[in-house]
């Protein structure tokens, strides 16, 4: 949008006596700051323009200015581009390409698809089921999809590798209906819509969910906003694979079908500049502008197409508007003075919606009748002819022209803004109505009218027999329309959507790769973040999987000690490095390259999560298994982008997610918004996330080795690993002899038994950075209180919980069968004394295993907000330091009747555990963020 600045100083010093009060307006982009090398010529041009304006009026002046801008662009004159154009089609009629298909045939089976989609949702509302669905979205977008399916979307058997199509979630009924005509789905399956487990014939998920329909859906697009973001990063990753020589993706296109209401989601628009910056001409957004969201108009007082045009064009996208169908061409051609275009420009979306909820007479009076010139344009047209003036998104030729132009455009991503009617063809109770999104069934008269519009050969008797169960329609596999439909898909490389479920396994490195991590750090203090980075550094050297590892970093590489990777792996940039880096002379210079391996996303966790998803699903989308390692401040992972990680799980992404600088007390000084004491809990809610909270480097080595085997071995699992790692350095021990690796991976093993027997016994369970405090607590218990404490390392509270829950579920369903014993129960079965759990997480994390811990169980944690202070002070405040653990153990012994409660009270007073100022500096407190 143009910004105007009034320069009063210039007005006051005007040199024109006849216009002393004239105010000079300076617009952005106008060359007021450039030297005028020929003032006389400039004055002549301006005078000519003034004369034109006076003689021919603003419309003619505007036309000539636009033509000049057009010619300047053709001649490659660098001038600011317009961000908004008239409310008409971008592609003029005379430049529309020939439509290559048989439009009559395609329209016939498009009508059948419309019918079956609506009937599927309608039948899902039958008595006793009532699971609903959305009818109107696909009704508005059927043409947008069908032009793509018939002429553009390439399947996986295509020589170029196939396209990636993100389908709008609410349009899923239409995709199922097409698959039914293709012979991929049965009527029984259609009747199982939204009844995935209860329907005997097999059910269909509500929306595109690959995890629920793994050989069909490829990309999840709900919740809304995730589709556009993930499509951008899928397109960028396709270039990444090509530029690094891993796969030729030059003939693969990414299509994202979106809704205009969806574009209000921050994720929908917030990353479109990435696509422009990366010149992703392999990406096309198709936005179905039916002008309505769930409750009402998207922009009742405005114009969403114009808004989106300005937004995308300003961000550097190629914009194609498909506003009006072919029936408008004659009227626009006859609009010699621009009255019709002016009417189109000035009518708000709320009125356009209302027009289509009425009839032709209403449109004549309330649209064309607002200007005598436009009223005269349609004077010879009947009300029905006016009513039949289609919107562009329902016109095969207009949509085809836009898609072809998008495919041919180079150097920019393209967005197609297609105007449609929500509930199109469904009748007066649906079309353009505010409630249409929530309407899930049709009345008998609506069914009959819909049948007539779609010309489906279904009789009144069939509809009246049971209005809840009107029949689906399929003409049979030998019908010419079905043969045509299938031939088009064969020519384009197979069915879409379709998902590859198997991929080649990787040759994984042996255990020797992890040797260094298992030796310990000696006297050197090393944080688990550094140990993790070192592990992957070793893996990057492996000739088989090294090139397939993709580090994903949201602008924190230096914090995590990964800046040494910049010069060796390099940062991926399609344009290479066109500047001289300020540190180019240094060994650890910031190096960008078109063949770089690192995806450095800037301060952008949302985009990083989308990159993780694209990389982590490459085994399916490209048959090229890639290994993402996405590392971030743990507070800004599941808390900030949990929805994206949930979608990654739905898409069955594999890889490593690393929550660095984890814990509530470890990140000294950073404070409330950075101190993470709950991401493990959030991660535990994601069924695909395998969570670990390792304390030692050798644990990390085993966990990563296990993760690679589970995700990339001979029988890969559709999971991803979430490791919480810390920035607090402490001495890393060597791997103990006879380490029970199986127990470590299950989530619990005995790390250090009490060195000698004492009067009383206890068990301390610790994870992550709490381990040094637990070990110190065991020493204090032995020296000060004559208590022998075994120290256990809990590598995964979450995995212990899941095992326990699974066993309980089996026990519930099969009470007469042995259900097994949870690992935590069997491990602690013979352990003496109370069990005290401590971590740098809120207590709800260790509380996950309470049902299966035998005996007295006490949990300590960091509940509440974090704050800025030293580590000892924070741990004393939350009572997770060694002294607090000692008191908790003594309280547990008192609860069991082993000692008097006064002993615990004595310890609490002695250690002053309620006094933050009394917190000592432990040997673990050697470093800062």
From Swiss-Prot:
Q: Which Gene3D superfamilies match?
A: 3.40.50.920, 3.40.50.970
- Look at the named UniProt entry and state the broad enzyme category this protein falls under: oxidoreductase
Q: One short Pfam family name for this protein?
A: PDH_E1_M
Cite the EC number: 1.2.4.1
Give cofactor(s), names only: Mg(2+); thiamine diphosphate
NCBIfam families linked: aceE (TIGR00759)
**What is the name attached to this protein's record?**
Pyruvate dehydrogenase E1 component
Species this protein is from: Mycolicibacterium smegmatis (strain ATCC 700084 / mc(2)155)
């Amino acid at each position: 949008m143009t910004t105007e600045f009034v320069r009063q100083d210039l007005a006051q010093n005007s040199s024109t006596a006849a216009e002393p009060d004239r105010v000079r307006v300076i617009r952005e982009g106008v060359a007021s700051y450039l030297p005028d090398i020929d003032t006389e010529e400039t004055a002549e041009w301006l005078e000519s323009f003034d004369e034109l304006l006076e003689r021919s009026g603003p419309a003619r002046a505007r036309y000539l200015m636009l033509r000049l801008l057009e010619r300047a662009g053709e001649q490659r004159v660098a001038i600011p581009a317009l961000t908004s154009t008239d409310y008409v089609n971008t592609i003029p009629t005379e430049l529309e390409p020939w439509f290559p298909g048989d439009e009559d045939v395609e329209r016939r089976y498009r009508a059948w698809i419309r019918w079956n989609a609506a009937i599927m949702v309608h039948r899902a509302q039958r008595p006793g089921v009532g699971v609903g669905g959305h009818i109107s979205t696909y009704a508005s977008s059927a043409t947008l999809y069908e032009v793509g399916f018939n002429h553009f979307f390439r399947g996986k058997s295509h020589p170029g590798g196939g396209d990636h199509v993100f389908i709008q979630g609410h349009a899923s009924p239409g995709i199922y209906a097409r698959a039914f005509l293709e012979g991929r789905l049965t009527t029984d399956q259609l009747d199982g819509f939204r009844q995935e487990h209860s329907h005997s014939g097999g059910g269909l998920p509500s929306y595109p969910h690959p995890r629920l329909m793994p050989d069909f859906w490829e990309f999840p697009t709900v919740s809304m906003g995730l589709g556009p973001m993930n499509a951008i990063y899928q397109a960028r990753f396709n270039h990444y694979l090509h530029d690094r020589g891993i796969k030729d993706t030059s003939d693969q296109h990414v299509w994202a079908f979106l809704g205009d209401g969806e574009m209000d989601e921050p994720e929908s628009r917030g990353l479109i500049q990435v696509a422009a910056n990366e010149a992703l001409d392999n990406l096309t957004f198709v936005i179905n502008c039916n002008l309505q969201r769930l409750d009402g108009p998207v922009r009742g007082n405005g114009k969403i197409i114009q808004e989106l045009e300005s937004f995308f064009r300003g961000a550097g996208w190629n914009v194609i508007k498909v506003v009006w169908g072919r029936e408008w061409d004659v009227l626009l051609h006859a609009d010699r003075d621009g009255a019709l275009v002016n009417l189109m420009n000035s009518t708000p979306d709320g009125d356009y919606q209302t027009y289509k909820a009425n009839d032709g007479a209403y449109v004549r009076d309330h649209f064309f009748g607002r200007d005598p010139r436009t009223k005269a344009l349609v004077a010879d047209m009947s009300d029905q002819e006016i009513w039949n003036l289609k919107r562009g998104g329902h016109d095969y030729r207009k949509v085809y022209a836009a898609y072809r132009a998008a495919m041919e455009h180079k150097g920019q991503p393209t967005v197609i803004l297609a105007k449609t009617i929500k509930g199109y063809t469904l009748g007066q109770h649906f079309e353009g109505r505010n409630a249409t999104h929530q309407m899930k069934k049709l009345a008998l008269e609506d069914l009959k009218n819909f049948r007539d519009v779609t010309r489906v050969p279904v009789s009144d008797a069939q509809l009246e027999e049971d209005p809840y169960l009107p029949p689906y329609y399929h003409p049979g596999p030998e019908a010419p329309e079905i043969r045509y439909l299938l031939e088009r898909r064969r020519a384009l490389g197979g069915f879409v959507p379709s998902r590859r479920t198997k991929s080649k396994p990787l040759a994984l490195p042996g255990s020797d790769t992890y040797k260094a991590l298992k030796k310990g750090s000696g006297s050197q203090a090393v944080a688990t973040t550094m140990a993790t980075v070192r592990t992957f550094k070793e893996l990057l050297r492996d000739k088989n999987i090294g090139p397939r590892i993709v580090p994903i970093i949201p602008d924190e590489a230096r914090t995590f000690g990964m800046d040494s990777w910049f010069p060796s792996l390099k940062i991926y940039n399609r344009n290479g490095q066109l500047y001289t880096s300020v540190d180019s002379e240094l060994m650890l210079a910031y190096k960008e390259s078109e063949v770089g391996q690192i995806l450095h996303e800037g301060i952008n966790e949302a985009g990083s999560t989308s990159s993780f998803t694209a990389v982590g699903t490459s085994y399916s989308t490209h048959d090229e298994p890639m290994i993402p390692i996405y590392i971030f401040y743990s507070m800004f992972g599941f808390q900030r982008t949990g929805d994206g990680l949930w979608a990654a799980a739905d898409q069955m992404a594999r890889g490593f997610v690393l929550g660095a600088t984890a814990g509530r007390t470890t990140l000294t000084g950073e404070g409330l918004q950075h101190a993470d004491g709950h991401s493990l809990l959030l991660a535990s809610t994601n069924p695909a996330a395998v969570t670990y909270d390792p304390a030692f480097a050798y644990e990390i080595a085993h966990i990563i080795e296990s993760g690679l085997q589970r995700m990339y071995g001979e029988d890969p699992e559709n999971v991803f690993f979430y490791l919480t790692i810390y920035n607090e350095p402490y001495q890393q021990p060597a791997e103990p002899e006879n380490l029970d690796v199986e127990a470590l991976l299950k989530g619990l093993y005995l790390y250090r038994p009490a060195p000698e027997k004492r009067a009383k016994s206890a068990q301390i369970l610790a994870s992550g950075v709490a381990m040094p405090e637990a070990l110190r607590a065991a020493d204090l218990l032995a020296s000060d209180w004559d208590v022998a404490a075994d120290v256990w390392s809990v590598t995964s509270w979450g995995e212990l919980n899941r095992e326990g829950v699974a066993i309980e579920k089996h026990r519930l369903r099969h009470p007469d069968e042995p259900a097994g014993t949870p690992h935590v129960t069997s491990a602690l079965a013979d352990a003496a004394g109370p069990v005290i759990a401590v971590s740098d997480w809120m207590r709800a994390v260790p509380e996950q295993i309470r049902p299966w811990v035998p005996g007295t169980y006490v949990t300590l944690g960091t509940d509440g907000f974090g704050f800025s202070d030293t580590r000892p002070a924070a741990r004393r405040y939350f009572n997770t330091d060694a002294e607090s653990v000692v008191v908790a153990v003594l309280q547990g012994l008192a609860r069991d009747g082993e000692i008097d409660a006064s002993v615990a009270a004595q310890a609490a007073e002695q250690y002053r555990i309620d006094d933050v100022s009394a917190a000592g500096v432990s040997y673990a407190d050697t470093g800062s963020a």
